[in-house]
């Protein structure tokens, strides 16, 4: 029995079915995908969650384990430029071609091209060790890490240094530093608190490339869902899990809001870990206290806007990052002194630049994302409207084109929606921050400490936040189930 059909739940379901288990997935919503759902309105097609497709090798590896290829389920195109970064008075397009990127770095900071070579050589080593070894550890014991290749490479992995300090060793120009720190924002912590190990994300960005699955990120969900069906997985949609029954130190049944009761030999929780622990389990069977959860460093939540325009915008790219205000203040308002941001950085995805099927002809599909602290209150319509006007005004100023008058559709999604729709702890969007003290065995365990047949997968356990890690998380937990239950 698997609770939730997000990326991790879909992954776990397929691995369990491949091993010969009868698998049932209970999903709260009426479609698969969890936070990666899709909605359609007025001819626009919006991805509700992830919008970046990085680490294509992880997706290819996933499907290959079932004798399939990514191209059996969806088609990819590499974006070039990969993305654009706006500062106050300029912007830079990040080319997909590495030689062009070296030239760009050299123009900005003489001598930095060779430094970029050295930086990425280190990042490549971390990526290879991380993707071939570290991320597949279930985090159940320190003994998992008594691996000679890991031990001898410990200092090369740079786990005790911060990514900020690591980047500053190589580059002096503030724009280059921001470019190299940007990928770790996906990991949910400030650069000075994120281990330099995660420069592997720079390798993923630059050498792996930025891709787009035709039809949007939901095409990946549909592909994984189709694979699971082919393997015999049963899906029960609109089944909101409300409780479990425990017998003999094991979950015996899972109950849903409709009053249905599902017997279970093994349960894998792919929904929010905190929700399952604190809301579904009786107190004596919770592995962690509420105090434990309240002390976790959470990745940010998001203020999201899905926007449809009745015209095309000239010269914009699929992905754009807006670093046109100081990062430090926004970072403090997310991590140090949680509050609604004064003047936030933001990100815009315009999938209609790459895909004519996500918007009506001569229209534009825009997705705005503003990172905000997890756990904020007063998520009101007035707050959402205020930030929408602020962000659109800055967007207009940076791209030099009017936008507001062309808006014919907009919908917001924020803290309270993450809680209501996904039972998200503190309304987080990405899970736990990837700090050193929340890495590997220091994350919430992928196996319950109190119930022998309850396991967890997804962004609040190993290996961490992000779509590729979620695919891996499903594989890791499935192998743990097989290890203990055959």
What kind of region is each of these model predictions?
Residues 200-251:
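Helical element adjacent to the flavin cofactor pocket in flavoenzyme catalytic cores
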Residues 154-163, 206-226, 379-387:
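Short beta-strand to alpha-helix junction loop
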Residues 1-128:
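N-terminal glycine-rich phosphate/pyrophosphate-binding loop and immediately adjacent elements
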Residues 242-360:
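Mid-domain catalytic core of redox enzymes
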Residues 88-194:
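Rossmann-like flavin
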Residues 310-419:
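C-terminal segments that line or cap access tunnels to active or ligand-binding sites in enzymes
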Residues 50, 459-482:
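A conserved FAD-binding loop/helix module that cradles the flavin
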Residues 173-187, 343-347, 401-463:
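A glycine-rich dinucleotide-binding beta-alpha-beta segment and adjacent secondary-structure elements
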